[in-house]
């Protein structure tokens, strides 16, 4: 849009990471109409005009686009993905950035739906697509703990507010808490298993592997507290009391402060 002193603005030069995924999750070889053969499975499309058209040939199945891959430019992509496509990207895209983007998009949709439930006075229910994507990410054996910690982090209340045209702080708070509570209850056993499987080394180290495990355990700890399962609460509290590093104790203290305020004083 026009701004004072600059009525006309030329388009930015935007490098746009792009790929197409087959229904099985495999990258499709990309061949432009003017080319004689495919040039790899991913491209950087150079956007230099307000409108641009590229035509790819040889696409035999309906693909799912993977856009702005690897954070190729600091832009917001406005593409109307279906819930099914977002679940697909969160599970099968070989671009880590876009997997996380798909998880955040699904979680925002889920929370915004729960906000509307709250405003209507109806029961707040988790979107089944987000529930499936969350469980798949939580149990993914190939992903690192550090990656899963990022992908499973739920949007902050501020981030939710930014996605809404009209902000209702009470509804946002209720929806975000309800989502954590329900995830903690639905997946308490799986979360507890992931929590136990990601014990860092006995001797504290800031190396990436142990740091990722601590980050994932912090996510699990928060969800276990939110779910309120008695066995999980006891197990989480024991871990907090016996933790050998300050990072986990601080993470636990923050979780208690935010989610179980009546226990904060005792734990601190």
Predicted regions mapped to residue ranges:
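Beta-strand-rich binding/interaction modules
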Residues: 1-59, 63-66
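Long, ordered, helix-rich scaffold segments
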Residues: 8, 46-48, 55-262, 266
């Amino acid at each position: 849009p026009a701004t004072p002193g600059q009525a006309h603005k030329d388009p930015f030069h935007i490098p746009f990471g792009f790929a197409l995924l087959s229904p099985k999750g495999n990258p499709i070889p990309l061949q432009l109409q003017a080319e004689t053969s495919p040039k790899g499975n991913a491209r950087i499309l150079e956007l230099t005009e307000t409108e641009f058209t590229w035509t790819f040939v040889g696409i035999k199945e309906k693909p799912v686009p993977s856009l702005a891959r690897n954070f190729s430019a600091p832009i917001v992509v406005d593409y109307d993905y279906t819930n099914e496509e977002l679940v697909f990207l969160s599970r099968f895209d070989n671009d880590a950035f876009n997997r996380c983007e798909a998880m955040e998009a699904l979680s925002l949709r889920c929370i915004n739906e729960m906000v509307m439930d709250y405003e209507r006075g109806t029961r707040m229910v988790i979107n089944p697509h987000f529930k499936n994507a969350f469980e798949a990410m939580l149990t993914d054996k190939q992903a690192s703990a550090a990656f899963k910690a990022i992908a499973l982090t739920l949007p902050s209340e501020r981030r939710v507010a930014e996605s809404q045209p009209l902000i209702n702080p009470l509804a946002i708070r209720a929806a975000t808490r309800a989502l954590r509570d329900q995830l903690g209850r639905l997946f308490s056993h799986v979360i507890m298993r992931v929590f136990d499987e990601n014990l860092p080394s006995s001797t504290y180290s800031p190396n990436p592997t142990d740091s990722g495990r601590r980050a994932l355990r912090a996510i699990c700890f928060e969800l276990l507290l939110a779910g309120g399962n008695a066995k999980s609460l006891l197990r989480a509290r024991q871990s907090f009391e016996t933790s050998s590093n300050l990072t986990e104790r601080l993470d636990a203290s923050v979780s208690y402060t935010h989610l179980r305020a009546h226990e904060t004083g005792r734990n601190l």
